[in-house]
Amino acid sequence: TPNRDFMRF
């Protein structure tokens, strides 16, 4: 999910 992409930070 795209929401997980924000956790890449």
From Swiss-Prot:
GO biological process terms on file: neuropeptide signaling pathway
A GO term from the CC aspect: extracellular region
Protein keywords: Amidation, Neuropeptide, Secreted
Top-level lineage group: Eukaryota
Cysteine disulfide links: none
Positions carrying Phenylalanine amide: 9
Family listed: Belongs to the FARP (FMRFamide related peptide) family.
Protein name in UniProt: CalliFMRFamide-10
Organism: Calliphora vomitoria (Blue bottle fly)
